[in-house]
A protein has these predicted regions:
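Asparagine-centered strand-capping/turn motif at beta-strand->loop junctions
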Residues: 50-54
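Short aromatic-acidic-glycine turn motif
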Residues: 67-77, 211-214
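Beta-strand-rich interaction surfaces with strong enrichment in secreted/lumenal proteins
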Residues: 20, 31-34, 48, 115-118, ...
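Bacterial Sec-dependent N-terminal signal peptides
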Residues: 1-23
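Short strand-edge motifs at loop-to-beta-strand transitions and within beta-strands
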Residues: 124-128, 140
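Extended, low-hydrophobicity, Ser/Thr/Pro/Gly-biased non-transmembrane segments
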Residues: 86-104, 108-112, 145-226
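N-terminal, polar/Ser/Thr-rich
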Residues: 17-43
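Short Pro-Gly-centered flexible turn/kink motifs
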Residues: 135-145
Length: 226
């Protein structure tokens, strides 16, 4: 049986109070994740305290599920196959992924303040309509369970890259979409840049003790993991 190490990370993002004409949403995350280094799979739980600092009433939320782009036939794959100047790291490589090489990110049991939400997932975007509307200046708690698989490396994320990194994981968790003065930004992922909500991240990661975890934030339990 493999021994596992548990890493606690806390990432702080400065949050300022804004006037109604200059506001910004805030999402504070707590996540607990188990990583299987043999199968490249991971599973976890997530809690978000979402603050509506906008002058608008929020009736729904969107999440990004980026790893689902790394499957044959995805919007990212189709775009790369049909544009005249595809990213040379991508080209037709997604279309050639086998089932065991694909990425995945799936959500289940999504709740708002303890009550289950109905949601729909379409490739890299998830939509959930709130049971309780979120008024300006108010907060709500969103909780979910998720699982995923790290894909073969195509761009930045992936398995066993040429530098010897076993698991490169970026944008790997269900990520709440941004809401700003233009409204929601639930853009499907097609290998463009990311747009997200400011907030704090409190993350617990459990994996094989023989692996070294690198990341941003502040390690909370250095004495426990050596």
């Amino acid at each position: 049986m493999h021994m596992k190490s548990v890493f606690y990370l806390f990432v702080f993002t400065p949050f300022l109070l804004f006037s109604q004409s200059n506001w910004q949403q805030n999402a504070d995350y707590k996540m607990s994740v188990d990583v299987n280094v043999k199968t490249f799979a991971f599973k976890g739980s997530q809690e978000i305290v979402y603050a509506n600092n906008s002058p608008d009433t929020i009736t729904k939320v969107y999440y990004h599920l980026y790893f689902n782009a790394f499957k044959p036939g995805s919007q990212m794959d189709v775009r790369s196959l049909n544009i005249s100047d595809p990213d040379r790291r991508v080209k037709d490589r997604i279309s050639k992924l086998t089932k065991s090489e694909e990425g995945n990110l799936s959500v289940f049991e999504l709740k708002q303040d303890g009550k289950e939400l109905v949601f729909e997932q379409q490739e890299t975007v998830l939509l959930a309509r709130l049971n309780k509307i979120l008024l300006p200046g108010k907060k709500t708690k969103l909780t979910l369970l998720f699982n995923g698989v790290v894909p073969k490396q195509i761009r930045r994320s992936g398995r066993n890259n040429k530098d010897g990194v076993a698991l490169s994981m970026t944008q790997w968790f269900p990520k709440l979409a941004e809401y700003d003065f233009e409204g929601w930004h639930p853009n499907p992922y097609i290998a463009r840049e990311f747009h997200g909500v400011w907030g704090n991240y409190d993350v617990k990661i459990t994996l094989d003790k023989n692996y070294i975890l690198g990341g941003t934030g502040y390690l909370q339990n250095p004495n426990e993991i050596g």
